[in-house]
Amino acid sequence: MPPHTQVIATAHSLADPESFWSYHATKLHWHRKPSRALTRHTKTLPSGVSHEHWSWFADGEISTSYNCVDRHVLAGHGDNVAIIWESPVTGSTETYTYAQLLDEIEVLAGVLREEGIKKGDVVIIYMPMIPAALIASLAITRLGAIHAAVFGGFAPQSLAQRIEAARPRAILTASCGIEGSKGPIAYRPLVEGAINASKFKPSKVIIWQRDQLRWNHPDKRNGQRNWQRLVKSARGRGIKAATVPVKGTEGVYIIYTSGTTGLPKGVLREAGGHAVGLALSTKTLFNIKGPGDVMFCASDIGWVVGHSYILYGPLLVGATTILYEGKPVGTPDAGIFWRLIEKHKANVLFTAPTAMRAMRKDDPENAFIEEVGGRGGLRSLRALFLAGERSEPSIVNVYQKLLGRFGADGATVVDNWWSSESGSPITGLMQNSRGAIISSSSSSDAEGEGHEQGQVGDEKSLALRPGSAGLPLPGFDVRVVDDEGNELSSGTMGNIVLGLPLAPTAFTNLFMEDERFYHGYLKRFDGRWVDTGDSGMLDGDGYLHVMSRSDDIINVAAHRLGTGTIEQAILSHPAISEAVVIGLPDPVKGHLPFAFIQPKTGYIPEKSTPPSTAGGHDSHLPAKPSEKLFTEVNTLVREQIGAIASLGGMIQGRGMLPKTRSGKTLRRVLRELVELAVKGDYEGFVNVPPTVEDGDVVDVARGRVREYFEGRAEKARL
């Protein structure tokens, strides 16, 4: 049997990156075509350290904004829908065609130009999930400037850090955000507090006024401007801005990701590689090829997934993107995703596993998907993509069965693995792998609408493997190595690394921090590999299994155990919906695996009162689980991993697992709480990052930890 076309495409991209990426670059419009795709060179840092470096499409000139909007309008697709905004928190829906979107972008870009924004400037976007945020991003890009999106609602100190790091000429913001059922959250005190705390002062703050809560009397003396008034004035005067192309290696955006020192790292996305790689990814991995296709990425523009697959990816290929202001549950219920898919005939849903867990928790019998799917409302849905954290097999299996019943023919769940640094998925299962194969006939058609019929391979969908994040995608050379950088055999867990160069969507540097880039990603393995910070293994067929962050490895009596592996075993218990494993300090073994579990809705522990219907965090549920449940879980762990992984303890509860806005569980917070509790300190400081979704959850976790360890100490005294 011939290899799958995804395997063929990835192998070609690594063996001959020049021909592979030069061909796919022809699918876009270049203001100046690049003479070559890849340039390799040696970079010498101020410290004297030298390392291998690379650049993509260095002498080309391109406009991402033009490729996302103008070229589709010029091709006669101006009446096609570009953006659908659904906001259940405000009861609003809006639709923008490509022609309408272009008009909005041209005028806002003209406004920004009049406000002093020019090529190379940085502009921070601090906004909720509203169309103005996407329009702002594309208007900034149109001027050749660089946008740096920050989650709307971030605390002033966190925003101040990003202001100091990015040194923006302006901040584009809104009068308020709306967090689920909590109502409007005023942005004014957050933005002004951040500017006051920052040593660097942006010259302008441009405010989108929302009806739900106004930013009254903007302070013009300090550069505050009313967004809608500026646009109205510019439109009345016929002010519009033309496209300003940038070099292939110049920035499109900066996205800040957490750093081990606590200071955010600014990942710089470069124009040429970003556009070429993202267009290919959207077409081949997601099978969103162009007009008529609809992508529903339930993410946030403050996260890399939102940048890539709410904003840029769908628009680069001329498809429709759904912009969603709401939550997976509670706005108004766990059926909102399925109803929106039905309403707009979405072909792809992309979200985080935590969203699916939340929907399962609120709808354990799958009543909502049964209702919508039962009337044929999900027949447009070809795939459910999951990313942001590890997708445990149990959640993948549940939704694979549901998609098989209600989705399009062949609908599948696709787990994919990537990062802010990579810009697009590193691994996954292509849904349109043929689109990645280079045409054997020609690669010369400038806008790239030719037929792609290269080397013949197996084009059937790759087999889903629950617990795996799929196979490597073009441009990413995925390896697993030991701590010395030596490659490991298949099935052996180690450090997941990437060979150089990285794919075009990936970063080649941090914004104005060359030394930090080297020390954070290249130094550990002497510049040979890029350290992803994740641990896992490649199986015999090349599928990647990401088990945990490297810093989530637990050393138990000299055995290195991945928390993700243990969590997977725990989640095979039918009564448990979520599990987080950390290391419990132990004087003999160094650490013992220690679990936080969330029982499924309806679970009634032994020796407890019936569940309350009053809400809250289930105060009837003791922090310490029953001996029966603990024994059953430990049996599963020993059977699936071995006795060395036996749990040293377990805390149960609901609403106690802190997560970031992007859905990642904050294991470090739980680990710090436990490490303090072991010392008898239940009120000690814990470093909670600004990305936390709900700070109150940390207090719930602290209370559960205290209850458990005080009970344990009392038992030890008896």
Mark where each language-model region is:
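Conserved AMP-binding/adenylate-forming core of the ANL superfamily
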Residues: S65-Y66, D79, I83-L138, A155-A160, ...
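Conserved pre-ATP/AMP-binding loop-to-beta segment of ANL
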Residues: D79-V81, V205-L213, P218-Y256, L263, ...
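Structural core segment of the AMP-binding/adenylate-forming
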Residues: L138, R142-R229, A352-P353, G615
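AMP-binding/adenylate-forming catalytic core of the ANL superfamily
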Residues: V150-S175, E342, L349, A446, ...
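Conserved C-terminal "lid"/linker of ANL adenylate-forming enzymes
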Residues: K204, I554, V580-D586, F594-F596, ...
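Conserved AMP-binding/adenylation subdomain of ANL enzymes
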Residues: G273-V294, V304-V348, K361-D362, A367
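Gly/Ser/Thr-rich phosphate-binding loop
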Residues: A319, N347-F350, K361-A463, D477
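Conserved ATP/PPi-binding loop(s) of AMP-dependent carboxylate-activating enzymes
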Residues: Q455-V456, K460, L471-G475, N486-K523, ...
